[in-house]
Amino acid sequence: MKANIHPAYAETTVVCGCGNTFQTRSTKPGGRIVVEVCSQCHPFYTGKQKILDSGGRVARFEKRYGKRKVGVDQVAAYPEQNNK
């Protein structure tokens, strides 16, 4: 490797918006990185994640057309289709 071309890789303190701090190594000058979200406060890691239905499309479809029953009732209702 060439000498004096690589950036300095030093200890850095990462500070989260929730107050959590931890040490890592980085090439960013200043020795301090401020982040908005970390593993201590992110909903995915804390288990408080909410799953959002995109507009309720499935629920709206089922409300309009209803759930169809597939089974003995439909087979008995259309005997001509069963003879094919």
Swiss-Prot record:
Keyword Transport: no
Cofactor binding remark: Binds 1 zinc ion per subunit.
Source species, domain of life: Bacteria
Name of one Pfam family that matches: Ribosomal_L31
Required cofactor names: Zn(2+)
Residue ranges the record marks as coiled coil: none
GO BP, one annotated term: translation
The keyword Coiled coil appears for this protein: no
Recorded GO MF terms: metal ion binding; rRNA binding; structural constituent of ribosome
Alphabetical list of InterPro entries matching this protein: Ribosomal_bL28/bL31-like_sf, Ribosomal_bL31, Ribosomal_bL31_A, Ribosomal_bL31_sf
Role this protein plays: Binds the 23S rRNA.
Record-stated family: Belongs to the bacterial ribosomal protein bL31 family. Type A subfamily.
HAMAP family assigned: Ribosomal_bL31_1
Protein known as: Large ribosomal subunit protein bL31
